Structures are given as C-alpha cells and as structure tokens.
Amino acid sequence: MHCPFCCAVDTKVIDSRLVGEGSSVRRRRQCVVCHERFTTFEVAELVMPRVVKSNDVREPFNEDKLRSGLMKALEKRPVSSDAVENAISHIKSKLRATGEREVASKSIGSLVMDELKKLDKVAYIRFASVYRSFEDIREFGEEIARLQD
C-alpha cells in the first residue's frame, strides 16, 4: 500500500484487529521510508446477485428499492430504523447465501414478507396486499387468517 504522506510504495503492518463483529479488519501501518503511521480498514467486497423481474428484465440489486418497499409498508408503524436495517441485512445475507448470480424478484418479495411478518403484522398485510395483488376484502381476510394460525 502506498504511503499517504510521502507516496512511498512500501509500508508495513504494525497491528491488525477485527472490528464490526468481525466483518472488517483495522490495520495500523507504518511507512518504511518516512516512518509515518496511518490506519486502514479492510472490508470484503460482497457481490449481490442480479434481479430477474417478472417480465424477464434483469437489473442490478438495488438496496434503496428494498429499503423503500419496507419503509412504505412500515409507514406510521412503531418499528425502529435499526430493526429495518437489520431486516435489510438479513435479506441481503440470504440472497448472497444462495450463491446464485441471478435471483427472481419474487424470491426477494418472499424474503421481505418473512422479515415483515417478524417485525409488524400490519406492515406485513400492507406489503402482502400489493405484492400478491389483492383484489377484494376476502383476500385480505384469508391472509389475516393465515397470519393468525
């Protein structure tokens, strides 16, 4: 790694520690030329699968779309932003764990529903009504009955 002070090509690692629950490494480095010290952080670059929509269009995974969908369902519901971020993290982990390069948007919708079911039942029904395209009150009732079982 290049020294940020003198631009020398060679630096040495003095100390390494795991941070962020083991998801990244903090390294203390020293330049072998000017002897200045600096800190670097190393994080694994995790690639998300591409999303295959119902019309067969493929697009990159968009975390903002995921967050937006969750936030719409959770609007005016007593769920913390930390809980939402944890749900997003769980969904992303499950998607990466598939090992697939592409994942159907329906799979993502199912994962969202699973997380919403744990977070807030009202938000779950809101999301399900759009995701499953409920046409009438009977379908709402059936979904609520399934939720209560």
Swiss-Prot record:
Biological processes per GO annotation: negative regulation of DNA-templated transcription
Pfam families: ATP-cone, Zn_ribbon_NrdR
Cofactor note: Binds 1 zinc ion.
Location of the ATP-cone domain: 49-139
Co-factor requirement: Zn(2+)
InterPro entries: ATP-cone_dom (IPR005144), NrdR-like_N (IPR055173), RNR_NrdR-like (IPR003796)
PANTHER family: TRANSCRIPTIONAL REPRESSOR NRDR (PTHR30455:SF2)
Listed name of the protein: Transcriptional repressor NrdR
Native source species: Erwinia tasmaniensis (strain DSM 17950 / CFBP 7177 / CIP 109463 / NCPPB 4357 / Et1/99)
Gene symbol of the encoding locus: nrdR
